[in-house]
Amino acid sequence: SYYPGCTLKTQAKELDASARRAAEALGSTLDELENWQCCGGVYPTSRDELATKLSSVRALAAAEKNGGILVTLCSACHNVIKQTNDLMINDPEKAQRVNNYLGPDDAYGGGTKVMHYLEVLRDEITFDAVAERVTAPLNGKKIAAYYGCLLLRPGKVMQMDDPENPRIMEDFISSLGAD
C-alpha cells in the first residue's frame, strides 16, 4: 500500500506523479491506500499522546490487511509512521490503549513493514534495475544528497541506512548516472 501523505497531494504533486511514473517504468505500481488520513505529524501539541497516533495506526492497520507493506515517500510521514509502528510493536500497553480507540474490527496487530520509496528501489527493485531502465542518464551532473533530520533518525527505529554514514541516496543518484 502506498501512503502519499498530505504534502504529496498539495505542495509536492510533482514528486508524487514522478514516483508513480518511475514505479510503472520499473514494472511496479504504487497502489494508494484508500481513505488515508494525515500521518499525525501536525498533531504534536495534542494533550493526549495516544490520540496523535491514531491516523498513523489506521494506515498501518489498513496496510496490514492489504499485504503488510506500507510505502511512504514523504520523510516526515515516514518518520511519524515508522516511529508509531515501533511503539505499537514494542509497547503492548500503549498498543492496547490505541487499539481500544479503534475498536476490534480495526485493531492493528503489528504486522506492517513500513518502507520508504528509496528502500523499495534499493531492496525490492534494486538500484541495478533502476540503472538499466534510465532513459536519460544524468552523466556528468554532480548532485548532492540531502537526508534532512527525519529520514534516518532515530537510527534504531528507522533502520534505513547508517545514520552516521548513509549511502542510500548517493547509490540512487549513481544509478541515475550522476556523480
Protein language model regions, located:
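Iron-sulfur cluster-binding electron-transfer modules in prokaryotic oxidoreductases
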Residues: 1-179
